[in-house]
Amino acid sequence: MDETVAMASRGRALEWQGTSPWSIWRSVVINKSRMRTMRQYNLPLLENVRTVGRFGMPMLEEQDVTAPETLIGFNYVAGAKKQSRNCGVHFFIDDYQFSRVWNQPERYVVPLGRFQCVLTPDFSTYMDMPEAMKIWNVFRSRLIGAYWQACGLKVIPTLQWAGPESFSYCFSGIPSNSTVAVSTVGCHNDPTAELYWRLGMEYAIDRLAPERILLYGDAIPFFDFGDTQVVAYRNSNVERMKKWAEEDQARAQDTEADPPTCRP
């Protein structure tokens, strides 16, 4: 037995001398229950992670990350080719499609490690959410990102915010002068959402001075990114739906051109 382990065992034995078996059993059960609760909230992932700001947001490390050629949604990771070194993984999809990375974070380290980089999870921060929930979702995004970095993955912070009231915490834990990612999904047909996107993006650029922005989705008209390099990626879901619509239209035209014949 390792000497350190043996000394610890002897120490526990001396500590428990004269203690009833019931007290010892209760102590063990309480400790196990406490650890189970801590794991439920992924608190062990905070070990060796620096936190910043009023709400103790996990601080991501600055990494030298090259912009990938393409981005795919996390929901397509399992079906991707084995070698995906020129591709990054994004989470600009519905929360239910990636909630498992929070519930079982260690399970997805190896699959995500096949890709060039991975964006931090984009847990929703809707305007009508309670403030506590928005803070919690930003915290979860940072913590999972910090954990992936500790596991050796190349991680790009995802910018997420709601209204101006969220600006005080939603950019905490993101290193300045680094590469960040942002999505415009859902902003183009909603004037209020587009306005808050503009306000939040301007604030993020002023505060973080990012070196590079990975922009997922159609650009917001006439938005000025200044001297920041912008790498644009198409919304693959929109492209996929357009393709399906074109295929459906082509099939409909073929059906009209070749009507079924009736046999006498």
Where are the model-predicted features located?
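Non-catalytic, usually N-terminal nucleic-acid engagement modules in DNA/RNA processing proteins
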Residues: 38-109, 129, 254-262
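Eukaryote-skewed repeat-based solenoidal scaffolds used as protein-protein interaction platforms
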Residues: 78-84, 89, 101-248
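C-terminal accessory extensions appended to soluble enzyme cores
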Residues: 1-63, 226-264
